[in-house]
């Protein structure tokens, strides 16, 4: 899980979602997991 000020899709499988007021990126590639911090 990377914590970044700007989260971006890193590939076509990445999805940007909002959970509990946080912006997250979920993906089949574990290295692409991000959240805004």
Swiss-Prot record:
Keywords: Ribonucleoprotein, Ribosomal protein
Pfam families recorded: Ribosomal_L36 (PF00444)
GO molecular function: structural constituent of ribosome
GO terms for biological process, alphabetical: translation
InterPro entries given in the database record: Ribosomal_bL36, Ribosomal_bL36_sp
Keyword Ribonucleoprotein tagged: yes
Protein name listed in UniProt: Large ribosomal subunit protein bL36
NCBIfam families found in the cross-reference section: rpmJ_bact
Family: Belongs to the bacterial ribosomal protein bL36 family.
The gene coding this protein: rpmJ
GO CC aspect terms: cytoplasm; ribonucleoprotein complex; ribosome
